[in-house]
């Protein structure tokens, strides 16, 4: 989903910044989009410092943030009684806390631009999925938090929304 968004936004002429834990994937994006307005950086969204550094680097490169798409996410497959608590924590750290961190540091710029904050969620944020308890919890948390943020920013001109794509091969 993220790669496709980057490619479509670049085709439309947008300035695009993206981060990933995978430097090889970022390098391939750069190679496949020479001369584009693309900024990439290795960062782990589950790490608050990485998120702050990424947003600061985006500001140095593009001066502002108009749209923030919180797309990073992982899943898990195990019934709760078999699931590792470390795995559930990792899912929450990436799927929920990564959104909180990136939004926290981008929000002042988005407010200046009256921009958009988008979260990529899942039907699991509305209906718990068996065998994916940690994933479902992360998406319920994401949607609840984004609904609260949307309400807080309702009169500010900032749009807050989330999308729930179906199963995607990535």
What are these language model-derived features?
Residues 1-15:
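Canonical Rossmann dinucleotide-binding motif of NAD(H)/NADP(H)-dependent dehydrogenases/reductases
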Residues 12-27:
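Conserved glycine-rich Rossmann-like NAD(P)H-binding loop of the short-chain dehydrogenase/reductase
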Residues 43-53, 85:
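The beta1-alpha1 cofactor-binding region of Rossmann-like NAD(H)/NADP(H)-dependent oxidoreductases
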Residues 79-80, 84-90:
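Substrate-binding pocket helix/loop in short-chain dehydrogenase/reductase
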Residues 80-81, 129-133:
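Active-site loop immediately N-terminal to the catalytic Tyr-X3-Lys motif
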Residues 103, 138:
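Active-site helix of classical SDR
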Residues 122:
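Residue(s) in the substrate-gating loop at a strand-loop-helix junction
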């Amino acid at each position: 989903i993220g790669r496709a968004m980057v490619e479509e936004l670049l085709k439309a002429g947008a300035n695009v910044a993206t981060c990933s834990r995978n430097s090889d994937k970022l390098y391939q994006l750069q190679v496949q989009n020479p001369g584009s307005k693309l900024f990439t950086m290795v960062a782990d969204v589950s790490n608050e410092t990485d998120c702050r550094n990424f947003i600061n680097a985006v500001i140095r490169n593009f001066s502002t943030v108009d749209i923030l798409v919180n797309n990073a996410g992982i899943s898990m497959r195990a019934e709760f009684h078999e699931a590792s608590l470390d795995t559930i924590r990792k899912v929450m750290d990436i799927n929920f806390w990564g959104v909180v961190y990136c939004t926290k540091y981008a929000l002042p710029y988005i407010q200046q631009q009256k921009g958009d904050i988008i979260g990529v969620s899942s039907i699991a944020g509305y209906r718990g999925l068996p065998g994916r308890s940690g994933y479902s919890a992360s998406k319920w948390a994401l949607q609840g938090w984004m609904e609260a943020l949307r309400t807080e920013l309702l009169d500010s001109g900032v749009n807050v929304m989330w999308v729930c794509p179906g199963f995607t091969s990535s």
